Structures are given as structure tokens and as C-alpha cells.
Design a protein with these regions (language model features):
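Active-site metal-binding loops of divalent metal-dependent hydrolases
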Residues: 56-57, 77-79, 106, 165-168, ...
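Conserved beta-strand hairpin/beta-sheet module of binuclear metal-dependent hydrolase folds
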Residues: 18, 29-91, 173-190, 207
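Active-site metal-binding motif and surrounding structural segment of the metallo-beta-lactamase
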Residues: 81-127
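Metallo-beta-lactamase
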Residues: 34, 128-182
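Structured catalytic core of nucleotide-sugar glycosyltransferases
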Residues: 53-63, 106-114, 132, 136, ...
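Cap/insert and terminal regions of metallo-dependent hydrolase folds
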Residues: 196-294
């Protein structure tokens, strides 16, 4: 009753009743007149930082989403088209919002649905000449071919620098992403050795996603043929937990806020083994967050350039 009396008092107030009474038929035109008096002001885009999200990582598929204020870019597209779209959907990303897809090399776990995705979504497809040749992309899709150490504009406010790395017979590249505020994030997988060139670039990054593919003892005791063991552990293979730990020990710097260990072998590694090996090497110098990216993602995102916690569960 008190609320009803209060509303009655307000409705009888002569000041409130000064607004003109408008019939239903007139209301639309009245609203248009009111809106026409509003002065449009330029809206500045809000800097939300750079978001790094692993959609999944491992021998059955790899893809990383980089999001900024105005751009969405995929590094690799190694799942089925349906699988990629489902993963993006969990993040609230409409596939048509993907500006570019950069494929690091031709192996299926990195390139599987890249062409189909680019055609369906209207995204730019980016690769080096060797990958484009092996995948037979030339002339069948809108393709941007890059050279070694070339910086590519992948979206309105993000560029990608490609750094060659040794891996089998593939012309593989590591990717250094840079937004318009100068923040850098690296995605580094499928390499048997961390080169001096790569180290120099990683020392400038605030986020590093890097593979820790196998535990050496576990690989050697496992059931793989000796030839495959040699390939995996060779210069053109993958990084072991030990190699990754040693590389990060050299790379870690005060501005490095997050590390993700990725592309872990399901047969020759375990998450806690990779994590403990790396922590033993960097625990005295690294104060950021260390995470493991698994095959079935997305599980979490990392943010650069925000005051919020850098790791956010998806």
C-alpha cells in the first residue's frame, strides 16, 4: 500500500506532468524528432589488450586464437571445420569474425581445415610458399604468401612476424604477434631446436606459448620404432621438456607475464612432468603464470594489457 500511495503522489505532481502527452500514433514521429537533436560523438575503440586462447593443442590438432580490440586471428587450423567452429562457439566467437588464418606449416594437425574455413568465413589465408604449394592452395582461395622474417598485417590492429624454425621437411615458422600498443605474444611449436634468432625475438614477448613435446626417458623407453625416436628427438623433430626448460631459462625476463606449454605428446609426456621440469629451471626468475594447453580446449585464456588476472578460465 505504501508503494502505491507513493506512486500516486508522484503522478499528481505538476512538475512531472509537464512532459507532453503523445498519442500512440504520434509516438514514433516524436521519438524520431528527439533522436534528431542528439549530437553524434566519435566513439573511441576501447583497448581490451591481447587475449591468447588455445583452442586445443597436441598431435591430433592445434589452433590458437589471438583477439584484440578490433581483430581475431587464428594461428593454425588443425581440427575439422566443425571442431574449430564448436571451439570458437564456446568463446562466443562467430566464425565470420575471424580476420585471418595463418598456417605455420603443412602438417595436417596444423592445416587440416584452413582452406575450408577461409572460404566459408571469408577470412584471409596466410602461409609461406612451401606450405601453399604442398596444400595446393594457390588459385583456389584468397591467399597471402609471406617470406622469412616478414611482418604481416593480419587484422586492423595486429601484425604477425614469422620466424623460421627447423622441423622435418616442413618450412615451419614460429609466430610473434604484435598489437598496436606494442604488446607481443609468441606461438612456437614443432621444432627440434630453439635457434639464436628465435631466442632474440622471444626475449621481447610478454606471453610465450611453446611446445614441450616429450620426456626424453619416456620416449626412449616407449614402443616407438628407433627411427621414429631419432626423428622426434633430432634437430628436425620436437622440443623435449628439458630443451624447453633450458630455452625458457635463457629467455625469461621481467616483462614476461605468462607461459603456456603446448603440443604435449599423449604417449611420451605427462603434464606434471613438463611443468615440473620447466619450473625447476625458471622458478627463481619467473613471476608470471605457467599453464598447460591440452588437446581438448579451450580451457583458459591469457590477457596482456589488463589489470585483471592474466589467466581466465573459459
Amino acid at each position: 500500500m505504501m508503494v502505491m500511495e507513493r506512486r500516486s503522489d508522484i503522478e499528481s505532481d505538476s512538475v512531472v506532468s509537464e512532459r507532453p502527452v503523445i498519442s500512440i500514433n504520434e509516438s514514433e514521429n516524436y521519438n524520431l524528432r528527439i533522436c534528431s537533436n542528439v549530437v553524434s560523438l566519435p566513439i573511441e575503440s576501447i583497448d581490451v589488450g591481447m587475449e591468447i586462447t588455445h583452442l586445443g593443442s597436441g598431435s591430433r590438432g592445434n589452433s590458437v586464437l589471438l583477439s584484440t580490440s578490433e581483430s581475431n586471428v587464428l594461428i593454425d587450423c588443425g581440427f575439422s571445420l566443425k571442431g574449430i567452429e564448436q571451439r570458437l562457439g564456446k568463446l562466443g566467437i562467430i566464425p565470420d569474425e575471424i580476420d585471418s588464418i595463418l598456417v605455420t606449416h603443412h602438417h595436417s594437425d596444423h592445416s587440416k581445415s584452413a582452406k575450408r574455413a577461409a572460404l566459408k568465413w571469408g577470412s584471409n589465408l596466410i602461409s609461406n610458399a612451401e606450405t601453399a604449394k604442398r596444400m595446393e592452395w594457390e588459385g583456389s582461395v584468397s591467399l597471402r604468401v609471406f617470406s622469412e622474417l616478414e611482418r604481416i598485417d593480419a587484422g586492423p590492429d595486429i601484425s604477425l612476424l614469422t620466424v623460421p624454425v627447423p622441423h622435418d621437411d616442413a618450412e615451419n615458422v614460429a609466430v610473434i604477434a604484435c598489437d598496436d600498443q606494442g604488446r607481443r605474444a609468441a606461438v612456437v611449436t614443432d621444432l627440434g631446436e630453439v635457434t639464436t634468432e628465435l631466442v632474440s625475438h622471444l626475449k621481447k614477448c610478454e606471453h610465450i606459448s611453446i611446445e614441450a613435446n616429450y620426456d626424453h626417458d619416456r620416449l626412449m623407453r616407449g614402443g616407438y620404432p628407433d627411427s621414429l625416436k631419432r626423428r622426434i628427438s633430432g634437430r628436425g623433430g620436437h622440443l623435449s621438456n628439458y630443451q624447453t626448460a633450458k630455452a625458457l631459462g635463457e629467455i625469461v625476463h621481467p616483462n614476461l607475464s605468462s607461459i603456456v606449454l603446448c603440443h604435449l605428446s599423449e604417449s611420451n609426456n605427462l603434464p606434471h612432468m613438463a611443468e615440473s621440469e620447466v619450473l625447476m629451471e625458471i622458478c627463481d626468475s619467473f613471476r608470471g603464470s605457467l599453464s598447460i594447453s591440452k588437446q581438448e580446449g579451450p580451457e583458459f585464456s591469457h590477457w596482456l594489457g589488463q589489470s585483471d588476472p592474466e589467466r581466465i578460465s573459459v
